[in-house]
A protein has these predicted regions:
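Helical hinge/lid and interdomain linker segments adjacent to catalytic or ligand-binding clefts
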Residues: 81-95, 107-116, 130-132, 145, ...
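Catalytic cores of extracellular degradative/oxidative enzymes
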Residues: 541-737
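Activation corresponds to long, low-complexity, non-globular regions
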Residues: 289, 296-403, 552, 556-570, ...
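Active-site-proximal alpha-helical
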Residues: 305-331, 337, 341, 562, ...
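Hydrophobic core
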Residues: 9, 13-17
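Beta-strand-enriched, solvent-exposed domains that form extended recognition/catalytic surfaces
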Residues: 394-528
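Beta/coil-rich, acidic/histidine-enriched accessory regions frequently appended to metallopeptidases
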Residues: 348, 352, 356, 363-412, ...
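Short, surface-exposed beta-strand/loop micro-motifs that present aromatic residues
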Residues: 133-144, 551-554, 773
Length: 816
């Protein structure tokens, strides 16, 4: 439900330069002016010895004793000519040193995870994936004479106060990579981390020059600092000679940003962190990873067998016809698939092992609803992600149709005739995807022509509407995990085919200069049913849906575009009304969230046969399942008018939600202020009538009474039994009943004011609801939010206490 929102709410801390999705050759870094390093002396930190209680782990979280055929006593690996031989005993001793005095670590945001792909790399602290598998949230590696360690989130060493035993973990990590050498840790262009590490007892020196950094025994730098092969080789040489390297990487965060802003989001090809980490024996995955206990990431949770690539390969070799035990099978399949997906293609032993798996006879399985590819099919999963990366690495060629294209997005009807010389006018004032009304059939070549004057604008052509990569998000695949591609329009003529096909879009990135009008010509694609508000009528739509036999169709308004199977939209009779409805909904959301005007791109909704999660989620595009109940509410006038359309209005709300007034527990709550606002303003359906029993006075009062009887636990506000977000939504529904929509309109506008005092954490977000409303209405709102068990701070309480008590007893109904 909150794929994009989590980017706003998670404190996504990426080191300067670490975000490097670069489809073209990177610009050379300007040489920094040499300055004396700023040394920050550490605060003294007592090295506490904590008695580590052995937390009972689940079966899948406990390392079992492998047979001798699976666990070698000593193994070697080579990367770029550097051989590193490490024994299991040395790795065990290293992990013991790193977690000495540490029972758990914790930080803000959702950290990413890693897979160790070489025997010289090892997991330090485990996290738990959504499916019960385990991978490192902190990983480390021996490399030549040196050492490296990577954390799954930069906020581990950027945020204070420290949570759990994070300070001790950081001190241990720096000591381990320094190997007893004297000298400060060089912190390269990462000022916030320097101060925080000093508070953890580490002596640091801030530097702006890499040569200066390499003069220290150890350095902290974002992987983006090494964005050329030459810089990376410098780093590898430095570590191999005995240097220490510490960094962070968030594969899932980078991927989400890249999908939304560059279009090039393949970990193995576009993520610079992989090019830094993989030669060290580690790859970053595209999954955020969860805690292993209430305190955070527990060091007492051991890694299960199969959590690293060498062990997973050994197990796969031991069971060539399939792994019999389910937990082990799931762990090994996850490790092999995610490692193959993230590993940059090279001539290493690890990549050769992936290629060998992909050539196994069982690898030929094609995902479809009839032949789903499950965790047991790890040979096929590895083949599919390798083929995907091979395609995306060389998209401008004629690729044959993939057999799974018939499942999604579907194939053109036989006998359809391709177009030639269709002109598309693209105005760069409108960002993101421009619909062409053309469909590329899987395996059929299309040619795109742009004028020479447009080559410097950064335009792209995209084939395919869905942006859901299900590689690691779904245990079972019924379609290929990635079916869309983006190609830079850096030549006047390019001919290519997509293995999967899909709608053709011309993409205007946010970096493209505005004020340009470009004529693009397309050959070889097929016309599809495409309604465009202001150009077409209900009558022309009826003719198009009857004439053009593409598997997908689009209806496009001024603010939003809906992409659905043609078979679904064939019943649509009034696209003029439907597009206006969604345009108006977008305008209302923009107004409520207090943006200065319409967005410079159109929102999108796409129906897919398999999503990353659930049946609906937000993002660009918003995604819904082709069989989701209520989909007709997206495009059927009578259904919308009679019942509203909660689902997509909810997801559209996520796209306009403001993280400044949404704290973590409220992510699925405040979004529905938008849902109710649009339902009321557009359809005249009042909040209490908007969603049956879930919003009725009777239903809400029952939930409140039950919650009060349980002692009003704040942990259940927004996520308790039998209420989902609807108990928490009552907090805001009562405010709307008492003060009208004006309360939210005025309140949200305050957060957009220049120089507004914006909250920095969840405590301040909650506090500002109370203080801002108290100042707006000159009444003490702290009482109200505390009646809902919000932990309002004493400082905020003091501000609110300047005003008289609220006297509206309906606000406090059943609460006291």
């Amino acid at each position: 439900m909150k794929r994009l929102l989590v980017l706003i709410l998670a404190v996504l801390t990426i080191a300067e330069g670490a975000f490097a999705a670069k489809p073209s050759r990177p610009a050379k870094e300007k040489p920094a002016k040499a300055t004396a390093p700023k040394v920050i002396r550490p605060k003294k930190i007592e090295r506490k010895k904590i008695e580590r209680k052995k937390t009972p782990a689940t079966k899948s979280a406990r390392r079992t004793s492998p047979s001798k055929t699976v666990q070698p006593s000593k193994r070697a690996t080579a990367h770029k000519g550097v051989e590193t031989t490490v024994s299991p005993e040395e790795i065990k001793a290293a992990r013991t040193e790193l977690i000495d005095g540490v029972s758990a670590i914790r930080t803000e945001g959702l950290p990413g995870s890693f897979i160790c792909v070489a025997p010289s790399a090892f997991g330090v602290v485990a996290g738990r994936n959504w499916d019960g598998t385990y991978h490192p949230v902190v990983a480390a590696a021996f490399y030549g004479k040196g050492r490296a360690i990577v954390f799954g989130h930069g906020s581990f060493f950027e945020t204070q106060p420290f949570q759990a035993d994070t300070a001790q973990m950081l001190a241990n990590a720096v000591a381990w990579i320094e190997q007893g050498k004297k000298g400060p840790l060089a912190v390269y262009r990462w000022g916030g981390a320097a101060k925080v590490l000093a508070a953890a007892g580490v002596e640091v020196a801030e530097v702006n020059d890499l040569d200066e950094a390499f003069a220290s025994p150890a350095l902290l730098a974002g992987a983006g600092a090494f964005d050329t092969p030459e810089k990376r080789q410098q780093l590898f040489d430095y570590i191999a000679k005995g240097g220490g390297y510490m960094t962070s990487s968030i594969g899932w965060g980078w991927k989400n940003i890249a999908q939304n802003y560059t279009g090039f989001s393949c970990l193995a090809l576009d993520f610079v962190d992989e090019k830094v980490l993989a030669p060290l024996g580690i790859v970053a995955t595209d999954l955020g990873i969860g805690h292993t206990g209430d305190e955070g990431y527990l060091t007492s949770v051991d890694f299960p067998l199969g959590a690293d690539l060498p062990a997973a390969l050994s197990i796969a070799e031991k069971y060539p016809d399939g792994i019999p035990e389910e937990t082990l099978r799931k762990q090994v399949s996850k490790t092999l698939t995610m490692a193959a997906d993230a590993y940059p293609p090279d001539d290493s032993a690890a990549y050769a092992a992936f290629l060998e798996l992909a050539q196994h006879p069982l690898a030929a399985k094609v995902p479809s609803p009839e032949t789903p590819v499950t965790a047991a099919d790890f040979y096929a999963r590895v083949r599919i992600v390798l083929e995907k990366n091979r395609w995306l690495a060389d998209p401008v060629r004629v690729w044959p149709a993939d057999p799974s294209a018939a499942t999604y997005p579907g194939l053109m009807a036989k006998g359809a005739k391709p177009v030639k010389g269709v002109e598309i006018q693209v105005e760069t004032d409108e960002r993101r995807w421009h619909s062409t009304g053309l469909f590329a059939n899987a395996g059929d070549p299309i040619t795109v022509h742009v004028p020479e004057s447009a080559l410097g604008l950064g335009l792209q052509v995209r084939v395919g509407t869905t942006d859901d990569d299900i590689s690691s998000a779904q245990a079972t695949w019924i379609r290929s995990p990635v079916v869309s591609e983006t190609i830079a329009l850096n030549k006047t003529t390019q001919t290519f085919s997509s293995p999967f096909g899909g709608f053709v879009y011309i993409v205007v990135p946010f970096s493209t200069p505005k004020g340009n009008v470009v004529q693009v010509k397309v050959d070889g694609a097929y016309r599809a049913p495409h309604f465009k508000r202001g150009r077409d009528t209900n009558k022309t739509w009826a003719k198009a849906i009857e004439t053009y036999h593409a598997p997908q169709a689009e209806i496009e308004g001024y603010r939003m575009v809906i992409t659905f199977p043609s078979s679904s939209l064939s019943s649509l009779t009034d696209p003029e009304w439907v597009t206006k409805f969604w345009d108006d909904a977008n305008d209302l959301d923009v107004s409520l969230t207090a943006l200065p005007g319409p967005l410079d791109f159109k929102q999108r909704v796409c129906a897919d046969t398999q999503l990353t999660a659930g049946f609906l989620h937000n993002g660009y595009p918003m995604m819904c399942h082709v069989s989701a109940d209520g989909n007709s509410g997206l495009y059927d006038k009578e259904t919308i008018q009679a019942h509203g359309v909660w689902g997509v209005l909810h997801e559209l709300g996520h796209n306009h939600q403001n993280g400044a007034w949404t704290f973590g527990k409220a992510a699925e709550v405040t979004v529905n202020i938008f849902t109710l606002y649009c339902t009321d303003k557009l359809l005249g359906i009042k909040p209490r009538d908007a969603f049956g029993e879930w919003m009725s006075v009777e239903g809400c009062d029952r939930r409140v009474s039950d919650w009060v009887a349980r002692g009003k636990p704040f942990d259940e506000w927004g996520a308790g039994p039998d209420n989902g977000p609807f108990l928490a939504l009552e907090t805001f529904t009562r405010l709307q009943e008492a003060y009208g929509w004006e309360l939210f309109e005025k309140l949200f506008a305050q957060y957009r004011q220049p120089g507004a005092d914006l909250p920095k954490n969840d405590q301040e977000r909650m506090d500002q609801w109370a203080t801002r409303l108290s100042e707006m209405y000159e009444a003490d709102f702290a009482d109200y939010f505390e009646a809902w068990s919000w932990p309002i701070s004493s400082e905020a309480r003091e501000i609110c206490a300047k005003y008289p008590k609220l006297e509206n007893e309906q606000l406090f109904r059943l609460l006291r």
